[in-house]
Amino acid sequence: MTQWQPASPTLWQGRDDSAEAANALRLFQTVTRSPTFSPEMYREKIALLGFACDEGVKRNQGRPGAAGAPDALRRALANLASHHGHDRLVDLGNIIAQAPDLEGAQQALRDAVRRCQQADMRTFVLGGGHETAFGHGAGLLDAFPHARVGIINLDAHLDLRRADHATSGTPFRQLAQLCDEQQREFHYACFGVSRAANTQALWDEAQQRGVTIVEDVDCDTAQAPLAQVIDSVDKIYLTIDLDVLPAWEMPAVSAPAALGVPLATVMRLVDAVCRSGKLQAVDMVEFNPRFDDDGNAARVAARLGWQIAHGWR
């Protein structure tokens, strides 16, 4: 059975510089920690929600360990300096998947996201494998049945696989099917795609679905297609698979990228989405702390998360 738990207060610790000045603060001092899942108490804030699940990665024959990512990322975020926007973060705890019930975990995340969005919160989910995306995206679609919701995925993989069961490789096919069921258009764009990591069958599926694709080798000039995607929708769900980054910047994922898109380039794309005024939901997925012996990969992911919370308009 899937369960919710508040985040441990021991995760949010860091250096206390408040004796220097009243505004010499770090995230551990400005993040609100909620003892209960009560999004209605935090309207117009950003819900920080963990999805402790890697069952989809296991089903996709990947390297398990992403279930430990939400808490590892909180630790890495905690000691970063708090600037504009960071005091909007409210830690609403973790949804913890109980293997092998991936579908139950995705439904729990879907319900939690819908409830947050309907309470006028925006959602920032820390995965988990990329199976996170179906629960997160479905909750957003449920909350805004009449909006044109655009999905922007920064990822080496299209994740449109055909499979008998949900995996970390199927979330956008599942969301496409959900859009069909809800009789709405499927707006999906994937930036950073590695042609070497996606079969022709996946490429064909993307073409049939009208997916906007920008390959990893073309992301230096991705601002124009990104602007077109942003202009074409009402609300945006941004999902960042950390394997979009090069292996030398992000080795701690299930499938490290041989080429990837450098962090500085990814940050420019993310900033454009954050500044659009349309960003409603974001997640970072596939971080695997088992392969982060020195903590550097967690710091890379945390820096990206810090930038999102800071720049989110």
Swiss-Prot record:
Keyword Protease among record annotations: no
Chain coiled-coil ranges: none
Protein family: Belongs to the arginase family.
Role this protein plays: Catalyzes the conversion of N-formimidoyl-L-glutamate to L-glutamate and formamide.
Pfam families given in the database record: Arginase
Binding-site positions, Mn(2+) 1: 130, 155, 159, 241
E.C. number(s) listed in UniProt: 3.5.3.8
SUPFAM superfamilies: Arginase/deacetylase (SSF52768)
Encoding gene per record: hutG
Entry note: cofactor: Binds 2 manganese ions per subunit.
CDD domains in UniProt: Formimidoylglutamase
GO BP: L-histidine catabolic process to glutamate and formamide; L-histidine catabolic process to glutamate and formate; putrescine biosynthetic process from arginine, via agmatine
Protein name (record): Formimidoylglutamase
Reaction it catalyzes: N-formimidoyl-L-glutamate + H2O = formamide + L-glutamate
